[in-house]
Amino acid sequence: MDGLEENGSVVQVGDLLPCKICGRTFFPLALKKHGPICQKTATKKRKTFDSSRQRAEGTDIPTVKPLKPRPEPPKKPSNWRRKHEEFIATIRAAKGLDQALKEGGKLPPPPPPSYDPDYIQCPYCQRRFNENAADRHINFCKEQAARISNKGKFSTDSKGKPASRPQYKPSPLKKSNPPGIPSSGSSRLPQPSTTSKTIVGVPTGKASSVNSPLGNKPQTLSPSHRAIAAPQAGANTKARNTTPPSLARNSVAGVLTNKRKTLTENYAARPDGDYTSSVNGGNSKGIEGNSSGHLPKFCHECGTKYPVEWAKFCCECGIRRMIL
C-alpha cells in the first residue's frame, strides 16, 4: 500500500510485525534494523541510574556511597516441639498441685526448670544470656568476681572474722607523785588526802598540806618542782615510820589543832577577792581575783604546756590554770 508522501519520499504502510525480544510491533523494514539492536540491549546488563549523584553535581553535598545490604543471619531451627512438651508438663504439674491441695495429701515435687539451649551460661554466676548479652556480661562478671575474692582475702583473717580497725591510743604521761599521795586511776576525780581534813564552814580551797612549809598558803608546785620534792617526802615518810604508834597519834592530833587555828585566822584576815577555788579536787587561785601572780607555763595536773599565755584552762585535762 502506498501511503503519504513525506519530503518527497513514499512511506509504505503494511502489516505490523512484533519483535521477538521486546514484543513491540514494527514495519518489516524497521523490524530488520531493530532486531540486532534489541538483541544487544537484552544481553547487556543495564546500569541503574543514580539520580542522587546527578543532583549532587555542582553542589557542596558529598556523594554518599550506597550501603551494601547486610547478609541476613541464618535462621535457627525452631524447637517448637520441646516448648510444647514443657508447656504440657507445666499444666499437668499445676493440676496435680491443685488436686493435692483439695485432697490435703502430700504435695508433688515441682517440675524441673527449663532452660533455653540457645542461651549461654555464665561460668561465674550460673545465669544464662543470649550471645550478644553474654559477651558483655561474662567480662563484667569476671572482673567483679576477682574484685570480690581479693577484697575477701584482705578483710578476713584466718578465723573468718573481719579484721578490726586499729584504734589510736595516746601514750600515757608519766607523773612523779610524792610517796605520801596515793595514785588514782583518774586524775580528774577528787581524792581524799590522808594527812588533812576539810573543816565545816571553811572553803575547801583553804585546806593546805601538812608538809607545806608556809602553813597559810596552798602548796602549788610545778612538775619540775614536784620531781625535786619527791625524794624529800620519801625521806620524811621513812622518818615517820620509825616513831612509835602512840607518839605518832599525838603528833597528828597536835598538827590538826594547830592547822585549824591557822586556817580560821587566815580566813578572817584575807580579803574577799583573794580566795582559792577547788576545781576537781585540785587547789587553785582564781585568775580574776589576783592577777598580780606569776602564771605557770605548764599544767600542774598533767604537765601539758599551755598553748597561749592568756589560757585559763588546760586544753588536755580541763583543770583551771593556777597562779603562783
From Swiss-Prot:
InterPro entries: ZC2HC1A/B-like, Znf_C2HC_C3H. Residues 188-198, 206-223 have a biased composition (Polar residues). Belongs to the ZC2HC1 family. This is Zinc finger C2HC domain-containing protein 1A. Its cofactor is Zn(2+). It holds the Pfam family zf-C2HC_2. Coiled coil: none annotated. It comes from Mus musculus. The modification Phosphothreonine is found at T243. The lineage of its organism: Eukaryota, Metazoa, Chordata, Craniata, Vertebrata. Residues 48-58 have a biased composition (Basic and acidic residues). Transmembrane segments: none annotated. Zn(2+) 1 binds at C19, C22, H34, C38. Zn(2+) 2 binds at C122, C125, H137, C141. The gene is Zc2hc1a. It comes from the Eukaryota.
